[in-house]
Amino acid sequence: FKNNSSFNSNISFWDTSNVVSMDQIFAFSNFNQNISSWDVSKVENFNRAFAYNTAFNQPIGDWDISSATNLSGMFRGSNEQNKTIFNQDISGWDTSNVLIASEMFAYATFNRDIGNWDTSSIRLFTAMFTYNPSFNQDIGGWDLSSMTESNNLINGSNYGSPGNRMNGMFRNASSFNQNISGWCVTDITSEPEFFAINSSLTEANKPVWGSCP
């Protein structure tokens, strides 16, 4: 349904139990129907599934995403004037196998508690909350242990040093000022480019680069 601005029918009854990829399924569309009953337990790729969709705001917090490895740009908006409005409770998602979360909430208005997410496998956080003016939740307990030099390959692609994988994470995230000073960032010796530029994040609340408190 990518680029289909008119489709908004009830498809809640679809059998999605064998689907492995929902890459851009509702991107650039106005789809906004309840699909909370979908079985997405085998879906590995949610890349930009709802990206650039400024209508979707349905409860999908009960989805079983335990097979997911790619959440890149899942709720990404287009720009500052066209942000996505998705703001449902997804705190219960099983993110233990996710490798990529880049741009997941970029240009979005998402502001829900995701502090208990298992981020221990995530290797790419680039621009995750960039230009999100709303997000200000406690994620100080996130496990960044996969952000190491030895994990530079993600799905066969080389994303370079760990520092590059956090570039612009909170860029222009104007509300964010949670304490993330406890993040273990041993392999990131200096602040990543544009990490929190134009955000509300104070120096005291930033990670202590090159350390593991």
Where are these regions (language model features)?
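Negatively charged
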Residues: 1-213
